[in-house]
């Protein structure tokens, strides 16, 4: 596949950003220690997996991306739209064990160096933000709830520079095979973007939704130039050899870890 995300042993990396001091990527599912499912490279401590497995996977990823896990930060995601400012004081949060810190956070941003923002995914949209000019990075977790409640807009509220200097990468997530019902469709029709651009009605109470496109449209609506938004062709629901899919695997699956850091 011709995509800016390039395959590595246990992750995909946005390769061209490495020379700009940005480490941006997402883990893949295979060649791990977890039985969730068998030989899975699960990165979530909050599902039924041995803590040892997640720690070993973290160490493996840290070596592959050359970013010490002691500098990672992980929030407790709740499918909302709250955003946290992260500093070096937060490094290590929820990495060795889960705590009450950063609970209810589905987006983070920082201006600090050597901090790796991380979150778990298995169909929801990872939205990465960066500006090398202003030394800014952010990461958002946008499922249908986060997309509907405009979590990308909430992140943009914390950008204190011209949005022409901001770049956004929309990472691997479910494709438009993901379907919603009439009630959820009606919610999306209240957003300030044209739902016809990302929702397709397929039958009674069945509507396919492209969450990646919805987030791209919202970002552009709120001022991020189209040419500054990159959307990967990788999809969790279309590439099960690479990714976990919560919906297709009926919840019995692991989680990928999306990450972004800057030197």
From Swiss-Prot:
This is Purine nucleoside phosphorylase SA1030. Keywords: Copper, Hydrolase, Metal-binding, Oxidoreductase, Transferase, Zinc. Its EC number is 2.4.2.1, 3.5.4.4, 2.4.2.28. The lineage of its organism: Bacteria, Bacillati, Bacillota, Bacilli, Bacillales. Pfam families: Cu-oxidase_4 (PF02578). One of its GO terms (molecular function) is adenosine deaminase activity. Belongs to the purine nucleoside phosphorylase YfiH/LACC1 family. SUPFAM superfamilies: CNF1/YfiH-like putative cysteine hydrolases. Its cofactor is Cu(2+); Zn(2+). It comes from the Bacteria. It catalyses: adenosine + phosphate = alpha-D-ribose 1-phosphate + adenine; S-methyl-5'-thioadenosine + phosphate = 5-(methylsulfanyl)-alpha-D-ribose 1-phosphate + adenine; inosine + phosphate = alpha-D-ribose 1-phosphate + hypoxanthine; adenosine + H2O + H(+) = inosine + NH4(+). NCBIfam families: peptidoglycan editing factor PgeF. Homodimer.
